Design a protein with these regions (language model features):
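A short, small-residue-rich loop immediately preceding and capping a beta-strand
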Residues: 82-105, 109-119
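Active-site segments that bind and position negatively charged phosphate/pyrophosphate groups
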Residues: 192-307
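C-terminal charged capping/lid subdomain of soluble metabolic enzymes
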Residues: 22, 290-360
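Short glycine/serine/threonine-rich phosphate/pyrophosphate-binding segments
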Residues: 20, 43-46, 72, 97-104, ...
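A glycine/threonine-rich phosphate-anchoring loop and its flanking beta-alpha core
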Residues: 107-200
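Structural motif
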Residues: 12, 34-35, 61, 88-91, ...
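ATP/NTP phosphate-donor binding region
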Residues: 1-89, 311
């Protein structure tokens, strides 16, 4: 398998304003009983509309409350509840942790899954990966569905009602994919399907980057007013679909690897995944020895749209050398993706790269 070029994707991707109205009809393709998982915030904001849609379609839906953290205990609890109800399809409505918990239930019960993201802050919706946390909110393991979600249904009207910070975080997550995939190509790194990259994966990563550079500012301005326009549609597709396909079939490198070191620090508890990745990309570009002008131009773009350029923006208000040391050490020890960097990276060199970003 590791010599074969491999590409994976959801069976179907649907996006547009009021797309969630079609949820009962789509779920009914897999059976008559849906297990709909939502947290309290999403249930309060969008639950009534989803319930109304199911009632209008005269479909059975069992609604279950997500506790807020994707742990083995939460997956087990939800799977038991779904099994008791003899459900046919799992529907995950919400953010990344809700979606990953729904994927976990789908895996436990071997039933189809429909993913309905309420925010476009990361590329979890299209992925078959399930990121599981421990009770201390640290990543404990990553599991995989046998295939990507059956359907990803993205309602851009719902996305636009969320705070613009979530869309911006999705941009931060997505913008790194082009550069990480390029490093994986150089090192012949395997993607998340255990195969080599396809030209399609690299093309999607490039397209993702181009869309982000062209449409981000206008999309963020629209979402600040809870409006949907073509710029928003482009950015949502980049954040969710292109970024998701790009990372799984293209691979990851240092930008994502640094999240291991960052999330080990209590200062980043309130930072979003994409914010961490965006900063991590700057470190990766320094490690790649990219021209200073290139990095400086990207920093300017970050500043223009609001992405973090320094650790102070991620919660490190009084940064000290020992914190940089720990970020670098944990990343080097625990992040598997750093080996995908074309230039070998020691802990000492990683510390130097972080400090150079902080001097930008």
């Amino acid at each position: 398998m590791d010599t074969l070029r491999t590409f994976g994707s959801p069976s179907r991707y649907i996006q547009g304003q009021d797309a969630s109205n079609a949820l009962p009809e789509i779920a009914a393709e897999f059976g008559t009983r849906s297990f709909v998982l939502m947290d309290d915030i999403v249930s309060s904001a969008f639950g009534p509309a989803i319930r109304k849609a199911y009632d209008a379609h005269q479909s059975a839906a069992i609604f279950s409350r997500f506790s807020g953290e994707c742990t083995l205990q939460e997956i087990g609890k939800q799977a038991k509840a779904a099994e008791r109800e003899k459900i046919d399809v799992v529907v995950g409505v919400g953010g990344g942790k809700t979606i990953d918990t729904a994927k976990g239930v789908s895996l436990e019960l071997d039933v189809p899954i429909v993913v309905v993201p309420s925010i476009a802050s990361n590329d979890a919706p299209t992925s078959r990966l399930i990121v599981i946390y421990d009770e201390d909110h640290r990543i404990s393991e990553v599991r995989k569905l046998p295939q990507n979600p059956d359907v990803v249904l993205v309602d851009t009207r719902v996305i636009a009602k969320a705070p613009a910070r979530f869309l911006l975080a999705g941009i931060g997550d997505a913008i790194a994919k082009k550069f990480e995939a390029e490093q994986c190509e150089k090192t012949n790194a395997l993607n998340f399907f255990g195969g080599r990259q396809t030209a399609t994966a690299l093309a999607l990563c490039n397209s993702c980057y181009e869309i982000i550079r062209k449409h981000s500012a206008a999309a963020l301005a629209a979402v600040e007013e809870n409006q949907v326009n073509d710029h928003v549609e482009y950015i949502v597709e980049a954040n969710v679909l292109l970024s998701g396909l790009g990372f799984e079939s293209g691979g990851l490198a240092l930008a994502h690897g640094l999240t291991r070191g960052l999330t080990a620090q209590k200062e980043t508890r309130n930072a979003l995944h994409g914010e961490l990745v965006a900063w991590g990309l700057l470190v990766q570009l320094i490690a790649e020895e990219r021209p200073a002008e290139f990095v400086s131009e990207l920093v300017t773009f970050y500043e223009d749209i609001g992405l973090p350029t320094r650790l102070s923006k991620l919660g490190f208000n009084n940064l000290i050398d020992s914190q940089i040391q720990e970020i670098a050490t944990v990343t080097h020890r625990e992040a598997p993706y750093i080996k995908n960097l074309a230039i070998p990276l020691s802990v000492g060199r990683l510390i130097e790269c972080i400090k150079e970003v902080e001097r930008q």
